[in-house]
UniProtKB/Swiss-Prot annotation:
Homotrimers of alpha 1(XVII)chains. Interacts (via cytoplasmic region) with ITGB4 (via cytoplasmic region). Interacts (via cytoplasmic region) with DST (via N-terminus). Interacts (via N-terminus) with PLEC. Interacts (via cytoplasmic region) with DSP. Its main location: other. Residues 1457-1470 are annotated as: Nonhelical region (NC1). Residues 597-609, 827-848, 891-914, 940-949, 982-992, 1166-1175, 1201-1215, 1253-1262, 1434-1443 have a biased composition (Pro residues). It comes from the Eukaryota. GO terms for biological process: hemidesmosome assembly. Residues 498-1470 are extracellular. It is found in: Cell junction, Hemidesmosome; Membrane. GO terms for cellular component: basement membrane; collagen trimer; extracellular region; hemidesmosome; membrane. Residues 1-573 are annotated as: Nonhelical region (NC16). The intracellular/endo domain is disulfide-linked. Prolines at the third position of the tripeptide repeating unit (G-X-Y) are hydroxylated in some or all of the chains. This is Collagen alpha-1(XVII) chain.
């Protein structure tokens, strides 16, 4: 029933609408935030902002309150109705079922408002419910407090008003009580009688008209009633329709009980929880407090807006303790926040029930926009004095006691806090809306506020359920479903029974009729017969008198029968008319009810909305609201403050700023003054243009640093802010602040510029000196390979011979890490494996085996140098070979040491016998791979394969690349590919000892020990690993001359060209093409004629032969070493902790330094040449030692302490460990330590130290033609500089544990053969792979799957070191061990320790000082790469905008701007 009347009050014409509504609503649950409860987004909007038709959609009583008039509401609730809104997305929370029928009549008038439609002003009182009001208050005192706090005017003191409020019938006083200290105004006259204030459902539907606090309801409705869980059950569009039944999707209740849209109908976010835009609603923008915003969960952000701009009374100040009480509401964000913030449910509980759970309500004071948290935000604050509310409650509940239980149905929940002994005291479900949501807080939602949101019908246990709190919503739901099913079953059964009964009745009636008819017929017949029989007896003379009684009776019977017959036929019927009355019953009142809802809608729209129209203008700000979100960024603005200085500069640019003014008056010009700009702010009004200026600022950030300077024009934007004074401007202003804030963040980014420094690390990359050599490789480098030749002699140790046998196993070596097609494993190392070679036969290597014999031809490999010519000629061949790691010459020799791996590698060496196969020697040309570095890269040797014929000589070769090169004969380079580097990784752990000095000492000890004859003899077999020295030394021509790879390359190229292959020799030629050409018999013949085959490089392969290395008694060796150490006074363990550093391994420079500094300098010699691993070839040429070192530093090697000794660098990382602990550990775990030490010693790098340059093995290159081919294939892949060469087989891990992260073992990163290029990978993967010891450490294992003990050893060492820091500790205490580790450092540079180590040793011996010069090159490399990172720097430029942010503040000076800012802050606070 809606009655509208106008009256004048205080000279103000007020239209009061008295809405009498009977609303039966059951709020099953609040919609989750972000979802609209009933999916009607419209519900919230009340016909445009223009009409502030406030529907106080209180749960209990939904009344329309016409904002235009003050609203007085009497709500009497009678009966409960459960409405379920299917549309609502609300989770059903068991706890809250708001089921109540509220009959409320409100008079809505805004008294004291300057105009009926004026937006209410809110007194700057904070509305905070405080549960502290424990004492019951008389209604009068409560009202008085409320009036005092809320009413701006003194009118509240008027006695008549007070009396009015006190009227028992009307003073349910839904408006929540407030503490005087912080409360939002509550209409003093709220006479909302929500008699059914069921626990959480009691909603204060009040609207505050700030202007007229005394008005019954200010424009803001307190529709806080909804427990969070039960936010408007479903809001129907009715709000606009004004059918108040927002909650009921069914719309049964005309008044939407729930979800009171704020005065801002538009915000009515209540209705659509989903509306985030309404978020501002929360904090109602100017008085547009979508009080119901609570309802819109989606507006969680709105809650942030909570403190909307001034006058943001969060209408839902009413808080229900139940909500606050549920501590468990994990969904508190959704429900509690909403409940507390938006809907503070009145606690209908006993007044004194303190809110057990302090829910902090954030309420923005109208002015400050600060958020006050009433600590006992518990809803209890709204507790009504018992006498008033309690009475009403009692009255309301009297109607339906069973529903008295919490709306949420969990009285128990409430009881948990303060057991409400009487139904009256339903605590609002603590969960209140605790939103159990689905995952709502467990708790509580007390009634599962979230889940069912008080979802009456669904989740909450009925009030009468004794276990309301213990039954989870789903149990109730299940129970309800089962109950419904049962009822349905009964219903259908009854229907069926009824049908059967009906049929039976019909049957009986039919039978009875039949019987009666039959009887009648018989009677009729008998009567007729009787009459007819008697008639004759009647004489004509008979008179009536003669009819005796019998005759008369017969006639009578006859007539009666006829009448009966007629009657049965229906001829006599006609009385039915009365039944018409029955028809009248057809129209049922129920339908009538729907009509009533319609009525409310029209009423709502009338006058009330009109007033809100003004607020509608505020709605525009609402648009800004989204900007408000940027406001969040605004905080960045503070960062901007530092910017201010920048802004000063911008001031200069202020000139540009003037452009901003263009839009508006010159005012923008002042920006130059910007310091003064604050004052201009006011002038801002033109600012509207200003905002554009701001946009310009945004552009500046894009510019990055420079544009930042342009930022100054941004200041003009500030003037624009002045413009913001225009209401519309405000939004713009907000936007500006936000933008500024963002730039601020970028400012922070600015520091990223530092990244450029990282570029320096890139220099370290240069360290990959080898890379630089690579370029030269094409020609000059070959010379270096000659150096490797010396190593070759070591290879000669004959140990290679053994490897030869193993050469076959080498084939497995190939398996070791092929990344795919590139099966080549660094042949070099295999050299020793050569012995293993026999296995080679199993694989393609088998063929290589024969080549093994040709291995000697390896020397021819030297012709591989001609391969270098390839490079020079087009560098395609040399590059290919280098990339492939194929060593034309003996390079394989170094691999020899690796021999052990060799087994894993192609068995080729084994085949040595079949030197004939040596023919593969042709691959030797790849030897050009050596490119610039004299040190032979294993790869290049491959080409020498042609020398294969000499393959007989290959015997030496066997040691070299044996297994790996597989087809060394094809190209000693295969040995290069072998690059056992992987084993090396273990070494790094040694570095740990941050004790750089100690690290050197240790290295010294170990070096001495290893150099000692007995150890060297003992370990000689081990040498195989060195294979890596792929860089076969100089190739010896048939004439015995040192053959220059470049020459060989040139010759081969010339030959190929003369053979008509010239076109294919272009630099663009693929490795496959070159390989194909090299494989040609004629080419092989040619190469054989010119190549002797890889020289001794294999020498290292002490393992050679039968793979003695594998059979080596590491336990014994470890004991020797330990004894040696102990005898040398070296203690274990102290350094232990450092272990981690090992990974870093030693930088190239450090290693060089260490080696040079060590006594074994002679042993180590300057292997520098390894750099040539030029496999990268060109890359090498561009990389200097400095570059490499810088790279290593960048890769983290830099962290390694200066001590050149490889150990030193690792040391830093080591520090983490506790040396003492290590020593203790060593003592306790001597066995483990010994095993680790053994693994470490057996690691290629250490072995290389021990063995010394494996060079001699080179010869083994010859092994297996097939291997060579495979090597070519493999190397070609690796040559891609994917760094696949060694580690490629393992995939990104790299043999050495991702020796190069992504890079191949030797290809480190993109790839130098030794990883000198380090590209992304870094030698040992220190760069990307995480170091051989890194996560990819297993790669070793993978690469050599079981083929080499070294792989396993390396893995073991790397893992154990990293995991236990054992060796690292040892490195600490036993500087010596670290020394070997040093090689690991190199590993970063080079995939394979052993080869690299030997190369380095040779290089150092020959070029002990060379490393220095590379350092210079390093300088060149550095910064550039890192520079790229510099880009981050651009972000820095945004920084300048930050200052603008400050200017934005000036904008804030503009009142509106300030307001916007405040909103922002508000949004943030929530």
């Amino acid at each position: 029933m809606d009655v509208t009347k106008k009256s004048k009050r205080d000279g103000t014409e007020v239209t009061e609408r008295i809405v009498t509504e009977t609303v039966t609503t059951r709020l099953t649950s609040l919609p989750p935030k972000g979802s609209t409860s009933n999916g009607y987004a419209k519900t919230g909007s009340l016909g445009g902002g223009s009409r502030l038709e406030k529907q106080s959609l209180t749960h209990g009583s939904s009344g329309y309150i016409n904002s235009s008039g003050s609203i007085r509401g009497n709500a009497s609730t009678s009966s409960y109705r459960r409405t379920h809104s299917p549309a609502s997305t609300l989770p059903n929370s068991p706890g809250s079922t708001f089921e109540r029928k509220a009959h409320m009549t409100r008079h809505g008038t805004y008294e004291g408002s300057s105009s009926g439609n004026s937006s209410p002003e809110y007194p700057r009182k904070e509305l905070a419910s405080s549960s502290t009001r424990g004492r019951s208050q008389t209604r009068e005192s409560e009202i008085r407090v409320r009036l005092q706090s809320a009413s701006p005017s003194t009118r509240w003191t008027e006695l008549d008003e007070v009396k009015r409020l006190l009227k028992g019938s009307r003073s349910a006083s839904a408006s929540p009580t407030r503490n005087t200290s912080n409360t939002l105004p509550i209409p003093k006259k709220g006479t909302v009688e929500t008699k059914t204030v069921t626990a959480s459902s009691h909603s204060v539907s009040g609207t505050y008209d700030s202007a007229i606090l005394d008005t019954n309801f200010p424009p803001h409705m307190w529709s806080s009633t909804l427990p969070a869980g039960s936010s408007l059950g479903t809001y129907q569009n009715n709000i606009t329709a004004q059918s108040t039944s927002l909650l009921n999707t069914n719309a049964y209740s005309t008044g939407s009980v729930f979800g009171v849209p704020n005065n801002m109908a538009s915000c009515s976010p209540t209705l659509h929880p989903g509306l985030s835009s309404c978020s501002s609603v929360f904090g109602m923008q100017n008085n547009l407090a979508p009080s119901s915003s609570v309802l819109s969960h989606g507006t969680t952000t709105a809650s942030t807006a909570y403190g909307a701009k001034k006058n943001v009374p969060q209408p839902p100040t009413v808080t229900s303790t139940g909500v606050s009480t549920s501590a468990t509401c994990t969904t508190s964000v959704q429900s509690d926040d909403l409940l507390h913030k938006d809907c503070k449910f009145l606690i209908l509980e006993k007044d004194n029930t303190p809110a057990k759970k302090e829910m902090e309500l954030l309420i923005m004071t109208k002015d400050s926009g600060k958020v006050f948290t009433a600590s006992p935000a518990t809803i209890s604050s709204t507790s009504f004095s018992e006498d008033t509310l309690k009475k009403e409650k009692q009255a309301a509940y009297a109607a339906d006691t069973c529903l008295k239980a919490d709306v949420n149905g969990d009285l128990n929940t409430v009881s948990t806090k303060s057991k409400m002994t009487s139904a009256e005291n339903h605590g609002y479900d603590r969960g209140g809306g605790g939103g159990r949501g689905k995952g709502g807080g467990a708790g509580g939602g007390g009634g599962g506020g979230g889940a069912s949101g008080g979802g009456g019908a669904w989740g909450a246990a009925p009030a009468w359920c004794p276990c309301g709190s213990c039954c989870s919503w789903w149990k109730w739901l299940l129970g309800l479903l089962l109950t419904w099913l049962l009822l349905l079953g009964l219903l259908f059964g009854l229907i069926a029974l009824a049908e059967e009964v009906r049929k039976l009745k019909a049957r009986v009636e039919e039978l009875e009729k039949t019987k009666v008819l039959y009887h009648d017929v018989q009677m009729d017949k008998s009567n007729r017969d009787r009459l007819q029989a008697e008639a004759p007896s009647l004489g004509p003379g008979l008179g009536k008198a003669e009819l005796d009684g019998y005759s008369q009776e017969a006639i009578w019977l006859f007539v009666r029968n006829k009448l009966m017959t007629e009657q049965e036929n229906g001829n006599l019927r006609g009385s039915p008319g009365p039944k018409g009355d029955m028809g009248s019953q057809g129209p049922k009142g129920d339908r009538g009810l729907p009509g009533t809802p319609g009525i409310p809608g029209p009423l709502g729209h009338p006058g009330p909305e009109g007033p809100k129209g003004q607020k509608g203008s505020i709605g525009d700000p609402g648009m800004e609201g989204p900007i408000g979100q940027r406001g969040l960024a605004g905080p960045m603005g503070p960062r901007g403050e530092p910017g201010p200085p920048g802004s000063g500069e911008k001031g200069d640019r202020g000139i540009a700023g003037e452009q901003g003014p263009q839009g508006l008056p010159g005012v923008p010009g002042p920006p130059g003054l910007r310091g003064h700009s604050g004052s201009p702010g006011p002038q801002g009004p033109p600012g509207a243009v200003g905002p554009q200026g701001l946009r310009g600022d945004v552009g500046l950030p894009g510019v990055k640093g420079d544009k930042g300077l342009m930022g100054p024009p941004g200041p003009k934007g500030d003037q624009g802010e002045k413009g913001p004074r225009g209401l519309t401007g405000e939004p713009g202003i907000r936007g500006l602040p936000g933008a500024v804030g963002e730039p601020g963040a970028k400012g922070a980014m600015g520091p990223a510029g530092a990244d450029g420094q990282q570029g320096s690390r890139g220099e370290q990359g240069l360290t990959g000196m080898p890379g630089t050599r690579g370029p030269p490789g094409p020609a000059g480098d070959p010379g270096k390979p000659g150096l490797t030749g010396p190593q070759g002699p070591q290879g000669l140790p004959g140990s290679p011979g053994r490897p030869g046998t193993k050469g076959e196993p080498g084939a497995p070596g190939r398996v070791m890490t092929s990344e795919g097609s590139s099966t080549i494993t660094v042949p070099g190392p295999p050299g020793p494996p050569g012995a293993m070679g026999p296995p080679g036969p199993p694989g393609t290597p088998g063929p290589a085996g024969p080549a093994g014999l040709p291995g000697q031809q390896g020397p021819r490999g030297e012709p591989g140098l001609a391969g270098d010519s390839f490079l020079s000629s087009g560098s395609s061949i040399s590059e290919v070979l280098s990339a492939q790691g194929v060593d034309l010459r003996g390079p394989p020799g170094p691999p020899g040491p690796r021999g052990p791996p060799g087994p894993s590698i192609p068995g080729p060496p084994g085949p040595r016998g079949p030197p004939g196969e040596g023919v593969p020697g042709p691959p030797g040309p790849p030897g050009s791979f050596l490119t610039d570095s004299e040190t032979f890269f294993t790869g290049p040797p491959g080409p020498p394969g042609p020398p294969g014929p000499k393959g007989d000589q290959g015997d030496p070769g066997v040691p070299g690349t044996p297994g790996i090169s597989g087809g060394l004969s094809h190209g000693a380079s295969s040995s290069t590919l072998y690059m056992q580097g992987p084993p090396g990784p273990p070494g790094p752990p040694g570095p740990p000892g941050s004790l750089s000095s100690s690290g050197q000492d240790i290295q010294h000890y170990i070096a001495e020990y290893m150099q000692s004859d007995n150890i060297r003899t003992y370990l000689s077999g081990v040498q195989g690993p060195p294979g890596p020295p792929g860089p076969p030394g100089p190739v010896i021509t048939i004439t015995g001359e040192t053959f220059d790879y470049s020459q060989l390359a040139s010759q081969v190229v010339s030959y190929l060209r003369s053979s008509g292959y010239g076109a294919g020799l272009s630099s663009a030629s693929s490795s496959e093409d070159i390989l194909a050409m090299l494989r040609r018999n004629d080419v092989w013949q040619y190469l054989r004629q010119n190549l002797v085959g890889p020289p001794g490089p294999p020498g290292p392969p002490g393992v050679s032969g039968d793979g003695s290395l594998l059979s080596l008694d590491y336990g014994e060796l470890s004991r020797h070493i330990l004894n040696y150490m102990s005898s040398s006074g070296i203690s274990f363990g102290h350094p232990g902790p450092p272990g981690p550093p090992g990974l870093p391994g030693t930088s190239y420079e450090e290693l060089l330094t260490m080696l040079r500094g060590s006594d074994y300098r002679n042993i180590i010699g300057p292997p520098g040449p390894p750099g040539p691993p030029g496999m990268p070839g060109n890359a090498w040429s561009s990389i200097s030692v400095e570059d490499l070192s810088s790279y290593l530093h960048t890769a983290g090697l830099s962290s390694i302490p200066g001590p050149p000794g490889p150990p030193g660098p690792p040391g830093p990382r080591g520090p983490p460990g506790v040396s003492a602990a290590l020593s203790t550990y060593a003592a306790e775990n001597s066995d483990n330590f010994r095993s680790e030490l053994i693994s470490y010693l057996t690691s290629p790098d250490v072995r290389s130290f021990i063995v010394g340059p494996p060079g001699p093995p080179g010869p083994q290159g010859p092994p297996g033609d097939g291997h060579l081919r495979e090597n070519y294939n493999w190397s070609s892949n690796s040559s891609a500089r994917r760094g696949t060469s060694y580690s490629s087989s393992t995939g990104t891990g790299g043999t050495n544990g991702g020796s190069l992260g992504e890079g191949g073992a030797y290809g480190a990163g993109d790839g130098g053969p030794y990883g000198t290029d380090i590209g992304p990978g870094g030698g040992y993967g220190a760069a990307a792979g995480g170091g051989i010891y890194g996560t990819n450490g297993d790669s070793f294992r993978d690469g050599f799957t079981g083929d080499l003990d070294y792989n396993k050893l390396a893995v073991r060492v790397s893992e154990s070191m990293q995991r236990q820091g054992l060796l690292q500790g040892m490195a600490y205490t036993v500087q010596g061990p670290p020394g070997p580790q040093g090689p690991p450092g190199i590993s970063r540079v080079f995939s394979a320790y052993s080869n690299v180590t030997q190369d380095l040793m040779d290089f150092f011996q020959t070029y002990g000082t060379i490393p220095g010069p590379p350092g210079q090159k390093g300088d060149v490399g550095t910064p550039g790469p890192k520079g790229d990172r510099g880009p981050a720097g651009p972000r820095g430029p945004p920084g300048p905008p930050g200052p603008r942010g400050n200017k934005g503040e000036k904008g804030d000076k503009g009142d509106q701007v300030y307001t916007g800012r405040r909103k922002r802050s508000i949004a943030i606070k929530p």
